Amino acid sequence: MRLRGRGPRAAPSSSSGAGDARRLAPPGRNPFVHELRLSALQKAQVAFMTLTLFPIRLLFAAFMMLLAWPFALVASLGPPDKEPEQPLALWRKVVDFLLKAIMRTMWFAGGFHRVAVKGRQALPTEAAILTLAPHSSYFDAIPVTMTMSSIVMKAESRDIPIWGTLIRYIRPVFVSRSDQDSRRKTVEEIKRRAQSNGKWPQIMIFPEGTCTNRTCLITFKPGAFIPGVPVQPVVLRYPNKLDTITWTWQGPGALKILWLTLCQFQNQVEIEFLPVYCPSEEEKRNPALYASNVRRVMAKALGVSVTDYTFEDCQLALAEGQLRLPADTCLLEFARLVRGLGLKPENLEKDLDKYSESARMKRGEKIRLPEFAAYLEVPVSDALEDMFSLFDESGGGEIDLREYVVALSVVCRPSQTLATIQLAFKMYGSPEDGSIDEADLSCILKTALGISELTVTDLFQAIDQEERGRITFDDFCGFAEMYPDFAEDYLYPDQTHSDSCAQTPPAPTPNGFCIDFSPEHSDFGRKNSCKKVD
């Protein structure tokens, strides 16, 4: 399985004239991975700063947060859902000014000596919602503290000592993960505030919903666009020579990012307020279109591509299982195309056995694009051709249907490695005893990992203790139970990456979530929100 190069296809623009003129090809880099490499000189600088300026900066930043706490406490007293008085009382204006000054001093102490601001922030009556992108770090809180705008936060955040008080001051929209109706209530609250004619503070939302490495803009969630009111796009840049800012799912952990950032002589950040985007009538009726068109405007300002990767792809990339997906896996692209065809992985899981039986009956017989379309019960389209090309390694216009089923199984249940392998054995196994040879195992694992080349000889020989030249699922399962880290020992050291990211190393241990300012969130990975193994 490989990601064959295909140029960007033309996509129809919306009738409003604001749609994407072209759907750009997927980025070469996985947007959920960040690799940080320090030169010898940079390592020496970090060592020097760790012993000198780092502890001073850390203590001073903590002191400034403590200094801000009593002001925020007094100003946040009272019912949180009560409409702010208009105009603001003089004492609240003073508190607001003091808190902004304290927060700016805190960032200055952390090395953010100059925060470049371009454009003009719109008034609340002009744009009640500010959409910020790309979302790449907890340092994205800088524009929040500079404007004291409201944000969307998890309800649990208000119980954090000191930080919770500071959060309550900006009157955030709290999302409760224990309330099944939370998403609807959140959107309704955003809509209520957005339509208050400037009575509430502006709401800052990161529509990507998770952190990326800023190489592209992933799919925007529609929560900020459902109210159908004008929004002001805001783009963030960190033009530093060494990127110690980015905090993604795979890469340096939160504490390491903080340490390395505070060990830089100075850190730069640029905040650009773009012109207010007023939705057309069509966009008001279609929040997804509205979100897509705003993303296009922001991507153009940033000079980056857009991709249809989503927050759910992040879950796929970081799913815990015995087969860890490499950073350059093609399965993210496969998952994107599955959704592009209108197929939902969560609904397809129950049909995997039916798909696998149909593929097994083919016994490796190759099929062409029209047959593939009939198998999926979808018309031939650009998205289907792109998906077909993922499995057409030779470029001969034919694919093995079994590979599609294996890839689909990984996307539908990314954490259930053995279930996918068992399904593959049923399709590839001999009719007599269900055994497979080394070539079959290589094909199964390459597809399950979404890569084009993989050496499985050592793994196959380790499983095939009797040297029969064939193994069964029971053999594989028994070996996996005895050596749960078999992939680390037998696959990844010799893994050759696909053409799409030839120089990308194996992905390190995943991080947890960045602070999510988007109204739509997931429970995935919360148990690992602070876990990091270096």
Curated annotation (Swiss-Prot):
<dbReference type="GO" id="GO:0036151">
    <property type="term" value="P:phosphatidylcholine acyl-chain remodeling"/>
</dbReference>
<dbReference type="GO" id="GO:0047192">
    <property type="term" value="F:1-alkylglycerophosphocholine O-acetyltransferase activity"/>
</dbReference>
<dbReference type="GO" id="GO:2001246">
    <property type="term" value="P:negative regulation of phosphatidylcholine biosynthetic process"/>
</dbReference>
<dbReference type="InterPro" id="IPR011992">
    <property type="entry name" value="EF-hand-dom_pair"/>
</dbReference>
<dbReference type="InterPro" id="IPR018247">
    <property type="entry name" value="EF_Hand_1_Ca_BS"/>
</dbReference>
<keyword id="KW-1003">Cell membrane</keyword>
<keyword id="KW-0594">Phospholipid biosynthesis</keyword>
<keyword id="KW-1133">Transmembrane helix</keyword>
<keyword id="KW-0106">Calcium</keyword>
<dbReference type="GO" id="GO:0008654">
    <property type="term" value="P:phospholipid biosynthetic process"/>
</dbReference>
<dbReference type="GO" id="GO:0047159">
    <property type="term" value="F:plasmalogen synthase activity"/>
</dbReference>
<feature type="short sequence motif" description="Di-lysine motif">
    <location>
        <begin position="531"/>
        <end position="534"/>
    </location>
</feature>
<feature type="short sequence motif" description="HXXXXD motif">
    <location>
        <begin position="135"/>
        <end position="140"/>
    </location>
</feature>
<dbReference type="GO" id="GO:0006656">
    <property type="term" value="P:phosphatidylcholine biosynthetic process"/>
</dbReference>
<feature type="domain" description="EF-hand 2">
    <location>
        <begin position="451"/>
        <end position="486"/>
    </location>
</feature>
<feature type="binding site">
    <location>
        <position position="398"/>
    </location>
    <ligand>
        <name>Ca(2+)</name>
    </ligand>
</feature>
<dbReference type="GO" id="GO:0005811">
    <property type="term" value="C:lipid droplet"/>
</dbReference>
<keyword id="KW-0677">Repeat</keyword>
<dbReference type="GO" id="GO:0000139">
    <property type="term" value="C:Golgi membrane"/>
</dbReference>
<dbReference type="GO" id="GO:0003841">
    <property type="term" value="F:1-acylglycerol-3-phosphate O-acyltransferase activity"/>
</dbReference>
<dbReference type="GO" id="GO:0047191">
    <property type="term" value="F:1-alkylglycerophosphocholine O-acyltransferase activity"/>
</dbReference>
<keyword id="KW-1208">Phospholipid metabolism</keyword>
<dbReference type="GO" id="GO:0060041">
    <property type="term" value="P:retina development in camera-type eye"/>
</dbReference>
<feature type="binding site">
    <location>
        <position position="394"/>
    </location>
    <ligand>
        <name>Ca(2+)</name>
    </ligand>
</feature>
<feature type="compositionally biased region" description="Low complexity">
    <location>
        <begin position="8"/>
        <end position="19"/>
    </location>
</feature>
<comment type="similarity">
    <text>Belongs to the 1-acyl-sn-glycerol-3-phosphate acyltransferase family.</text>
</comment>
<keyword id="KW-0444">Lipid biosynthesis</keyword>
<dbReference type="GO" id="GO:0045732">
    <property type="term" value="P:positive regulation of protein catabolic process"/>
</dbReference>
<keyword id="KW-0333">Golgi apparatus</keyword>
<dbReference type="GO" id="GO:0005509">
    <property type="term" value="F:calcium ion binding"/>
</dbReference>
<feature type="binding site">
    <location>
        <position position="403"/>
    </location>
    <ligand>
        <name>Ca(2+)</name>
    </ligand>
</feature>
<dbReference type="GO" id="GO:0016020">
    <property type="term" value="C:membrane"/>
</dbReference>
<keyword id="KW-0808">Transferase</keyword>
<feature type="region of interest" description="Disordered">
    <location>
        <begin position="1"/>
        <end position="25"/>
    </location>
</feature>
<dbReference type="GO" id="GO:0043129">
    <property type="term" value="P:surfactant homeostasis"/>
</dbReference>
<feature type="transmembrane region" description="Helical; Signal-anchor for type II membrane protein">
    <location>
        <begin position="58"/>
        <end position="78"/>
    </location>
</feature>
<dbReference type="GO" id="GO:0005794">
    <property type="term" value="C:Golgi apparatus"/>
</dbReference>
<comment type="pathway">
    <text>Lipid metabolism; phospholipid metabolism.</text>
</comment>
<dbReference type="GO" id="GO:0005886">
    <property type="term" value="C:plasma membrane"/>
</dbReference>
<dbReference type="Pfam" id="PF01553">
    <property type="entry name" value="Acyltransferase"/>
</dbReference>
<dbReference type="GO" id="GO:0030163">
    <property type="term" value="P:protein catabolic process"/>
</dbReference>
<dbReference type="GO" id="GO:0005783">
    <property type="term" value="C:endoplasmic reticulum"/>
</dbReference>
